Regions:
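Helix-to-loop junction immediately C-terminal to a conserved catalytic motif
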Residues: 65
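Walker B catalytic motif
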Residues: 178-179
Length: 258
């Protein structure tokens, strides 16, 4: 697997926009969740989202997938406005994959049968189905785990299974929600390597939201910090940790990437 530098400070130079939020706002009743936010996710980049609980990170993922609609503003995927597109259209047309923080697999099925079940939904050709499953088992080193029920896998193994399930549909965009949550250091390192390899080998554009600031910044090309429904800082990992507003609202004065 690829060796992860301590922090990925240089961003990808491809400037084609894959996801764009333009003046997007969202409210739940009288509570303003997102307040006129604007950002772009560039092709093949790993784009991180940081912020305290309730800042709007998961809401952004729900807006991208189409689970909810914005109150105002425009969301574009591959340059096309998608505000009124349902979930299945966005998933199929724009080849987006979503990995939730919890679940995302069939607990009582084996790892192999999880892959088989989802492949039968997203892959029509039976021979390609088998080939794809075998390739993913090899890629994720699942050979010794394939006959174990998903509920008996470790936290990191479950996370990797959910990513593998998302890859069955050959996504161009991958959304990872709290991918590093409640995992040990070695498992996080393995997931970081997996994510960077997907960028380098499969040219997948990846968005990650997480609370683990150092782990996320070690993986990302670009990241942004949300607070009270607004993007308060955006840039490379080194830019963010030196941003005064980001330190005040999120990192604190003692945070360092060294």
């Amino acid at each position: 697997m690829a060796i992860i530098k301590k922090f990925r400070i240089k961003s990808y130079k491809k400037l084609d926009t894959i996801i764009e939020f333009e003046n997007v706002s969202l409210s739940y009743g009288n509570r303003l969740i997102l307040d006129n936010i604007n950002f772009k996710v560039n092709k093949n980049s790993i784009h991180g989202m940081l912020g305290p609980n309730g800042a709007g990170k998961s809401t952004i993922f729900n807006l991208i997938t189409g689970l909810i609609k914005p109150k105002s503003g425009t969301i574009r995927i591959f340059g096309e406005e998608v505000n009124n597109y349902p979930v299945y259209t966005r998933t199929k047309k724009f080849k987006t994959g979503y990995c939730p923080q919890y679940g995302g697999f069939f607990s009582d099925l084996t790892l192999h049968d999880n892959l088989k079940a989802i492949s039968e939904i997203v892959i029509d050709n039976k021979n390609y189905r088998t080939e794809k499953i075998n390739n993913l088992i090899t890629k994720f080193e699942f050979e010794n785990l394939k006959d174990i029920k998903a509920k008996f896998l470790s936290g990191g193994q479950k996370k990797r299974l959910v990513i593998a399930l998302a890859l069955l549909s050959d996504p161009k965009v991958l959304l990872l929600d709290e991918v590093y949550a409640a995992l040990d250091v070695l498992t996080i390192k393995m997931l970081q390597e997996t994510i960077v390899n997907l960028q380098q080998e499969n040219q997948i554009t990846t968005c990650i939201c997480d609370h683990q600031a150092r782990d996320l910044l070690a993986t990302c090309d670009v990241a942004m910090i949300l607070n009270n429904g607004k993007i308060i800082a955006e840039g490379s990992p080194s830019d963010l940790v030196n941003n005064i507003e980001a330190k005040s609202a999120y990192f604190g004065d003692s945070f360092s990437i060294k």
